[in-house]
Structure formats: C-alpha cells, structure tokens
C-alpha cells in the first residue's frame, strides 16, 4: 500500500516540482528502503508509521555505516514524502518532523592541483574525441560547471558567435 503512495509522490516531484532525474532516483531509493524496513516490521499503512519507526530506521542505517550526509538526505526525503501525504489528507502528522538530522561537517570542494591544471591546458589533442574531451574539461574548469550540467549540454545551447553557452543548472534553473 505504501508503494502506491511513493509512486504518486515521485510523479508529483517529477511533473509538478520538476525535480532532476538524480534527485528523483535518490528519493525513490530512500523511500523504498524505508518501505522494506516498515514492511518487515508489519507496518503497511502510512497512518501506522510513528516517529520511533523513523528513528529506528535511521539508527539501523547509521550502524550499517551510512554517512551523516546520506542520513540527512534520507531524512529530508522522508519529511518531504510525509508532508506530501499531509497535504493530500492521508496523514494528520509528519512522523519524521521531530527526528533530528545528524550533524555533518561542511567540506569545501578540493581545488585541482596546479600541475594537473597545467597538464590539462598544455595537452595537445590528436583526434576528434580528444578535442571534444579537452573542450569539455576546459569549459568545466573555467566556468565551474557541475558534471551533470556539462553532460546535459546540447549543441543548441552553445553559441560560437557569442562565445557563450546556456546551462540548465541544479533544479533545471537557467
């Protein structure tokens, strides 16, 4: 029964909220893991899910070695899902609302090594694929694009005349 609500929620995120494929995948994976845990504990309806079930699941995942960052993302998925069920009138309270997220250390991205950047910029491509790969690496390095943003670029997004490209960022923002 919970699975049909999960599918509805994922469709809502895709169609109404316009979430990226990666985000949809992560939400679905997190919610499916929770559903398996709940089913094993004979909890089959959303109304039966209590705060202690969410805490128990998170603690189980922590003991399995999941990182605080992953646990935080999972809790965020659960809170969003239960808020959706609240809005749909299926639940009266969000069982994940009071579950505290684990503390995560904020880490800055690692800068590329100077020698590696020099090698990249000095590299002379020999064929079409190497020319393409060097152009992609230089674009990513010089503009700070995410890998997913680079992979989603189309030829129509690039203007050689204006020396610019149009990028759909995280959350499909331009």
Where are these regions (language model features)?
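Conserved catalytic core of the tyrosine transesterase superfamily
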Residues: 1-174
